[in-house]
Amino acid sequence: MAYRLARGLGRLLLQGVFGFRVEARGRENLPPGGGYLLLAAVHRGWMDPFLALDAVPVEPRVWTLGSGPSGFDRAWKERLLRIVGGVLPVWRGGVGIEVHVAAARAVLERGGVFSTFVEGTIGGPPDRPTPFRNGAFVIALRTGAPIVPLAVAGTEVLYRGKRFATRLMPPVTMAELVGEEWNGVPEPGSREELAVARRAAEALEALLAPVIAGIHPATVDPPGRRRRWPWLTGLLLGRPRA
């Protein structure tokens, strides 16, 4: 109940107060129920996980693997994230992949959705992804869960009335991403596992890149349009306004 209320209040704040507009498509591609990995790109700011939440239904619940330093760098952010819930913070150098695999298994076995942004860090061009990290694909190998790709665009700068776009794509498996080179699930912790994860990361990047490039123009305002409340970039993204 608290989770539903928090999501409703969050939508009221972002769309009603800040006037953010989201063009979200592709829910028809979601598998019935939960138990899948939601792997998203691009990752350009603190707003991105909220767009991932907006892209999917309220239930099943989404748990997001996110950056501890950027998500909890201000007291108000920490309070908001604790109210909304579902954030699994990552602190660089803190834990190994086994902890994240265990967290993903716990979420998936209960019918939830495990989400992360596969670039692994914030920053890069607004209309194309930076190279994907291997970690999410190791999780996919060890859990056997299907992958739902999510394209996100428009969060590189914020102001009142800013437009965003998301696209959910049909589920894919690790075997489908790897293609003809797939020889089954490799031994956990082996070099082969890392090699398979890398091939899958490159394949998903190739799959998402044209979708991101295609939806980004819809988030860009015409030249000369006045930007109201440009300070939202600094407030929500933690960097100077554009």
Kindly give the residue locations of the regions a language model identified.
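Structural motif corresponding to alpha-helix initiation and N-cap regions
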Residues: 24, 74-75, 98-101
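Active-site phosphate/pyrophosphate- and oxyanion-stabilizing loops and adjacent acidic/basic residues
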Residues: 11, 78-79, 137
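Helix-to-loop junction immediately C-terminal to a conserved catalytic motif
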Residues: 11-43
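Helix-enriched interaction subdomains in cytosolic or periplasmic regions
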Residues: 1-9
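Non-catalytic C-terminal accessory region of glycerolipid acyltransferases
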Residues: 98-242
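Catalytic core of membrane glycerolipid acyltransferases/transacylases, capturing the structured
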Residues: 32-94
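A generic structural signal for well-ordered alpha-helical segments
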Residues: 15, 81-82, 107, 140
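Short, flexible loop segments at the rims of nucleotide/cofactor-binding pockets, characterized by
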Residues: 13-19, 41, 90-95, 125-127
